Structures are given as C-alpha cells and as structure tokens.
From Swiss-Prot:
InterPro entries: DNA_mismatch_repair_MutS_C (IPR000432), DNA_mismatch_repair_MutS_core (IPR007696), DNA_mismatch_repair_MutS_sf (IPR036187), MSSS (IPR046893), MutS (IPR045076), MutS2 (IPR005747), P-loop_NTPase (IPR027417), Smr_dom (IPR002625). HAMAP family: MutS2 (MF_00092). The keyword Disulfide bond does not apply. It is an enzyme of class 3 (hydrolase). It comes from Bacillus cereus (strain G9842). This is Endonuclease MutS2. It holds the Pfam family MSSS. The lineage of its organism: Bacteria, Bacillati, Bacillota, Bacilli, Bacillales. Endonuclease that is involved in the suppression of homologous recombination and thus may have a key role in the control of bacterial genetic diversity. One of its GO terms (molecular function) is ATP-dependent DNA damage sensor activity. One of its GO terms (biological process) is rescue of stalled ribosome. Residues 711-786 form the Smr domain. The keyword Nuclease applies. Homodimer. Binds to stalled ribosomes, contacting rRNA. ATP binds at G335, P336, N337, T338, G339, G340, K341, T342.
Length: 786
C-alpha cells in the first residue's frame, strides 16, 4: 500500500485514535506497526477476531488487561545473566498475573456458553507460571522493596539492624536531653550523615564528645559529630547493612535465574497479551465510532450502507449509501466544489483501509466490502515547492504513477480530476484517464466540476453519475450523495438568493444554450424524484421494521402461551397419574384387609360390607378424571379413523392427532408435546376443513396456535437454532404445509451450512434450495416438505 495513499486518506489519524484504546505499550507498538493487509483470509480472520472482542465488550463492558507492561528487554537481560532490580522483577510478576487473569477471563466466558473460538485459541497459548509469579511477589512488595519474609536470613539481619538503630538512637537522645546539651548543641536532634548517626555540635564544643566529624554546616558553626560512645555501635550497624545488601542481591539473583529458566514461555505469553491488547483496542474503537463488522467478499464489489467518515463527529456527519462494483465500476461525482464531494471520496477510501486492517467500519449491518491489492488516491493540493511543480503538474505526476500500476485489483480515487488547467483540455484529459483505468478493470470513484463528465457518465456502460445534494434555501450542501443524479452548479439559484436581480440572471440564462437549460431542468427533476423515492423508501423501511418487531413479539407470546399450556397439561397428567397410583395402593390395601379378615375368620363379610368396600374403592378414583367424566355413550367415532386424523380427547378436552393404532380399541395420540395411548371410546372425530395455499398461516393439527411460513434464525446460537429448526419442521408437517422458508442470513455461512446438513437427514424434507432474488437469496433456504 502506497505511503502517500495512507497519508492523504488520513489513515494515521485513525491509528492515533486507535492508540487511545490500548492498555499497554505492547498494544501501542502493535498499533504503530499496523498496515492494511491484502490477504483475503487474513482480513476475514481479523474481522472475526475484532467481532469476538466486541462481543466480550458488549457482554462484560471491558477486558482485564491492567498490569501488563513491556517486559521483553528485562527478560532478555535475565537470559544473559544480568541481575534484575526489584521493580523489574515485579513488572514481570504483574505481567504474568495479567496474562493468567486474561486467560481465565476468556475461558470462564466460554464455559458459560459464549462462543469465542478465536479468542479461546489465543488464550490457550498462555502458559501459567503461577509458581514463579508467587515467588516474586512473596519476595518483593508492592512498592518494589524486598520484604523481610524473602528469606529467614534477611529477616534475622533486619532484626539486628532495627535493634542496633534503636540502641544508637536511645544513647544519642539521652545525650541531647542532658542539662549541658542546650549550650553545646545547635539543635536537640539526632540525624544521619554518611549513613551514620550524628548530633549537631557547636564548633567551640567539638572536643567534648570526641568521636568523628562527618559534616559541617554552611557557616561552619555547626559540626555533625558521631560521638565516640556510639562508634562501635555504628560500625556494627554498617556491618549488618552490608550483610543485608548481600542477602538482597542473592535473592534478586535467585529470582532472576528463575525468570531466565522460563524466559521463552514468558516472552511467548507477552506476545499473546500484546495481540489481545491490540485486538481489544480495535473493539473499543469500534464501539467509540459506532462501527460494525463488514462482510468481506472476494468478488470485487462493495456495498457501504449509511457510511460515515470516522474522523468526523457522528452527530453532524450525513451518512451515505455507496455501492461500487456490481452494476457499475466507476462513480463520477459532479457538482460545485463546496458540495462535500471530497468527504465522500475519503469515506470510501478510509473504510476500505480500515476494513483491510481488521478494523470495524462506521457503516450499518450487512454492509459488504472487497479486498484491493492496491489503493491509489490523488486528493488535495500537494504541489511541490522544491520541484517547482504547479498544482496541475503535481496531480499529473501522481496520475502518471497511478496509470503505471493500476489493475483489476485496484481501487482508484481521483479528486477534481483534470483541474488546474484549461477547462476543455482538463475535461478531455479526465475522460481519457477514466477510460484507461476503467479498461483495466479497476474500481474508480472520481470527483469533478466539469459538466462534460456528466455526459461521460451516461455514455459509458460501467459508469454512473452521482452528486452531492445542495439546498438552495440555506445555500449549503446537505452532503447527501445522490447516485444516478449528476450535479448542478446552482449558480443562478444561489445568486438569486443572495440578491442578484432577476434581470441580470435572465440575461445570464440567455447566454446558455437551450440544451444546457434542458439538462439542468432534467437534473433538478431527477434530484426531486430521488429525494421523494428515498423518503418513501425510508418510511416503508421503518414500517417494515416495526411490523417485524410486532411479528416477533406475537410469535414470542404465542410460543410462551403454548409452552405454558403444554406445561400445565403435563403437570395435570402427572398429578392424575399420581392420584391413580395412590388409588391403586389404597385399593390393594382394602383388598388385603378383606383377605386377612376372611383368612382369620375374624369377620363374616356380608353383602352390605362388600358394597361398602366397593364404594370406598370407587372413592379413590382420581378427582381430575371424575370431574372430567363424560358420557361416552354414542360418542365412539362413527367414521373410520386413520393415522393423521384430528380428534378431541374427551378426558382432557384437548385436540390431538392420531399417530398409529396400537390395539383394536386404542390409538397412539399426539397432544401438544405429549404422546399417549387413548381408547377410541374416549375420542371424538373432528372434521377439519382442508387448508388452502393462499393462506399466510395455518393451524397445526392437534395444537391451538398458528405456525408461520417463515422461521427466522438470525442472531441465534448454533445449537439453539438447530433445536428450533427441528421443532419448526415438525409443526409445519402437522400443519400440512407444502413449503416453508428458513431465514439464516448470509454471515459466515456456518448457520446456513448447519441448516442444510440437517435438512439432508430429515425424513420429512422432499427438497430444498436457496431463495430466489425476491425471496432473500443466499440468506434464505426454501424447504419443500413431503
């Protein structure tokens, strides 16, 4: 990618904003070396990786990247035998903790069902060095000091030091509090000079205390003397401090050697967390600019929906739909210089550069972008003073370079093509240059104010005109891109609004040919028509989204209602079975009691006693069944029953569907989610009218709700989606649908492939195919049922 292209499209400014979201110098280093890729597979993977990080941010709000620092140079020094300082070792421990914490964070999310395959692969490379981490933190405190507990020897030495210091202070403080001290001392304090305890003695009393003079005041009137009585104590203290220093060095060398042993693992972990910092910086930046993941294709076309420039405040910028590469390969944006054409040009360029860098781009969902091997841009006034080149010459130098390198894998951006010279010659050159790059198969967006290029857009098959809308009432551009409508100068309208007389304007119109006036009027009508069409489309789109939302809500309520009903039915059946079981047990108890009475001949069971026992037995029948008891006399179905018929199960008052006959008098019946055996005498045949193909929805046999002709799986997890497909196909078959549609979206294709793999194995599927253009294309699978 040309450095000049990155500069004029302000790629580095995007990187500067991205830098603000890194958590460490490791991530910042990755951002500084970021350049757009030209490898399709790599770009797709980078986009998927950024998308996973964005998912983590949506679910968790942030990622635990704190405490990570660039420790690579310290680890390399440890490998060659240098002793690391306490702070350097502490940085290594903190980074090891940070990498371990990040690994646990991602793995916990995965364990909780969040799909993060790429991030999971990244953190799987992190090797926990918990033992080394704890050794360092056990020896070095948060402030970077080696703690007493680092070794028993160090603890003992420091105990000696504290004892010696206490004895010295005690002796010196007694001296400063003596009656003679007031006249002999400059101040009643104990201080330190050259790491030895001293007191401030006046010059004239230097011989009173004996000992060693370590320092004097600026005036020379005060001497800092170590009295003779504490010289030996100070010597002992210094010896203890030397031992302390030696023990600290031994501990630091020991820890450094431990780091050296694990150096390769530590460096590998650092590289992983550097990548994670970089990845999450891209995700945080996407959130900041309200960007989305584009669909990356290798078919050389782009479809940017509501595209915005990332460096312009999203509250003031006007988003635009920009398509290139399908119906046309070149867009020529015409109109006055004040219309924001250059912003549109730069928006296309920077979106492509960002996408090829793995960054999400400021567009709406489902936007598509392709991969270009080269991006060329001739934008702005970059005349060279050193080379004494004019504006025109400077542009032409760039254009010559572009024409030498552009091919069918290139995106070429021209700003004010042909400007800076005679208008007629400039327009002619612009047309020839556009022809040249178009013939090479490049994708081109060019801006110009030459009216001759309006005709060029109509005369070339792969070229389309466009313009940036201008509001003559406010005398300012709206920055709305109108594809298919060439630009107008609006000079007469602007002049009139600014107060120029009608007489002068009319005279000016007379100097313009009739054909030109007709063209301008035609363009004005095209602008108005397009604005009206776009307004109508936006209103229709809003209504469609509202309808879809209502439809989803109704479907949710229906599903909840039926799930609740089925749950209650299942609960009622379970309670009924429990009551029947209890009745059987009580009946067995009654019978056993009668047998024992007879066997023991304790009681002569008479008729009235048997009647009473029978009454008790009947009284144990389930209350549910008794309440729902129906007179089945004459209710046995008169019509010959067949599998698939719809019946009413009288015991439960529910509709069901006959599955198969299991005996002469019993059928297997599907009631909602339940399958049970039911006697023919407990059924009532239902004569259901045939469904017509014109109806949008149909009743599912045996159920009290409707099934849609479409199943929308977009946004579903894979496992949940497959369960919904299975249930939906069963319901659709029960409803006798000949054909249904499953909406899975385009996306990465994983869900689409999963649906079609399932359809291959389903016994009820006769055939399936992708949707036609009017049915949703590759985002929909149309299923034909048996």
């Amino acid at each position: 990618m040309l450095e000049r292209t990155l500069r004029v499209l302000e790629y580095n400014k995007v990187k500067e904003q991205l830098l603000e979201h890194t958590a460490s110098s490791l991530g910042r280093d990755k951002v500084k070396h970021l350049v757009p890729s030209t490898d399709f597979e790599e770009i797709v993977e980078m986009q998927d990786t950024t998308d996973e990080a964005a998912k983590v941010i949506r679910l968790k709000g942030s990622a635990p990247l704190g405490g990570i620092t660039d420790i690579r140079s310290n680890v390399k020094r440890a490998k060659i035998g240098s002793m690391l300082s306490p702070n350097e070792l502490l940085d290594i421990a903190n980074t090891m903790y940070g990498s371990r914490n990040m690994k646990r964070f991602i793995e916990d999310m995965v364990d909780n069902g969040v799909e993060l395959p790429i991030l999971e692969t990244h953190v799987a490379q992190i090797v926990s060095l918990y033992d080394l981490e704890k050794k360092i933190t056990n020896c070095i405190g948060d402030g970077g000091e080696v703690v007493d507990s680092a070794s028993d020897k160090l603890r003992g030495i420091r105990t000696q030091i504290r004892t010696a210091e206490s004895r010295i202070r005690e002796k010196l403080e007694n001296m400063t509090r003596s009656s003679n001290a007031q006249k002999m001392l400059s101040d009643s304090i104990v201080t330190i000079r050259n790491e030895r305890y001293v007191i401030p003695v006046k010059q004239e009393y230097r011989g009173v205390y004996g000992g060693i003079v370590h320092d004097q005041s600026a005036s020379g009137q005060t001497l800092f003397i170590e009295p003779q009585v504490i010289v030996e104590l100070n010597n002992a203290l210094q010896e203890a401090r030397v031992k302390e220093k030696q023990e600290i060095e031994r501990i630091l060398l020991m820890l450094t050697e431990e780091v050296a042993v694990e150096a390769d693992i530590v460096l590998s972990n650092v590289e992983v967390v550097a990548n994670l910092d970089f990845i999450f910086a891209k995700a945080f930046y996407a959130k900041r600019i309200k960007a989305t993941k584009p669909i990356v294709n290798n078919e050389r076309y782009m479809d940017l929906r509501q595209a915005r420039h990332p460096l312009i405040d999203p509250e003031i910028i006007v988003p635009n739909n920009i398509m290139l590469g399908k119906d046309f390969t070149t867009i020529v944006i015409t109109g006055p210089n004040t219309g924001g054409k250059t912003v549109t040009l730069k928006t296309v360029g920077i979106c492509v550069l960002m996408a090829q860098s793995g960054l999400h781009i400021p567009v709406m969902d489902e936007s598509e972008i392709c991969v270009f091997k080269n991006i060329f841009a001739d934008i702005g006034d970059e005349q060279s003073i050193e080379q004494s080149l004019s504006t025109f010459s400077s542009h032409m130098v760039n254009i010559v370079d572009i024409l030498e390198k552009a091919d069918f894998e290139s995106l070429v951006l021209f700003d004010e093509l042909g400007a800076g010279t005679d208008p007629q010659e400039g327009a002619a050159l612009a047309i020839s240059i556009l022809d040249e790059v178009c013939n090479r198969g490049a994708r081109v967006v060019a801006t110009t104010h030459y009216p001759e290029l309006k005709a060029y857009g109509y005369n070339r098959e792969q070229v389309i005109n466009a313009s940036v809308e201008f509001d003559v009432n406010t005398l300012s551009p709206t920055y709305k891109l109108l594809i298919g409508v060439p630009g107008r100068s609006n000079a007469f309208e602007i002049s009139k609004r600014l107060g120029l007389s009608d007489r002068v304007i009319d005279q000016a119109r007379n100097h313009i040919s009739t054909d030109t006036n007709k063209i301008e009027n035609m363009i004005a009508k095209l602008e108005e028509s397009q604005k009206n069409a776009e307004r109508d489309w936006n209103e229709a789109e809003a209504l469609r989204k509202q309808s879809e939302k209502l439809h989803r809500e109704l479907q949710r309520q229906i599903i909840e209602f039926n799930d609740e009903r089925d749950e209650k039915l299942l609960k009622a059946q379970k309670e009924g079975e429990e009551k029947v079981e209890a009745a059987k047990k009580e009946a067995e108890g009654i019978i056993q009691e009668l047998r024992q009475l007879r066997k023991a001949q304790l009681v002569n069971v008479k008729d009235h006693e048997l009647i009473e026992a029978k009454s008790r037995l009947e009284g144990t029948a389930p209350e549910l069944v008794k309440k729902q008891k129906v007179n089945v006399k004459n209710t046995a179905p008169k019509q010959q029953l067949r599998a698939g018929d719809e019946v009413k199960v009288l015991t439960f008052g529910q509709k069901g569907q006959l599955l198969e006959k299991v005996s002469d008098t019993e059928w297997s019946v599907q009631i909602g989610i339940l399958k049970m055996k039911v006697k023919e005498s407990n059924m009532e045949y239902i004569n259901t009218p045939k469904q017509t193909e014109k109806k949008a929805v149909a009743s599912v046999k045996g159920r009290d709700y409707h099934v849609s002709l479409e199943l929308d799986l977009r946004g579903e997890r894979y496992e949940d989606a497959m369960m919904r497909v299975e249930k939906y196909l069963d319901d659709a078959q029960l409803a006798s649908y000949p054909r249904v549609s499953i909406i899975h979206g385009k996306g990465t294709g994983a869900l689409r492939q999963g649906v079609q793999d399932y359809l291959k194995k389903h016994r009820g599927v006769k055939n399936y195919r992708y949707g036609d253009m009017g049915e949703g294309g590759l985002g929909v699978t149309v299923v034909e049922l048996k």
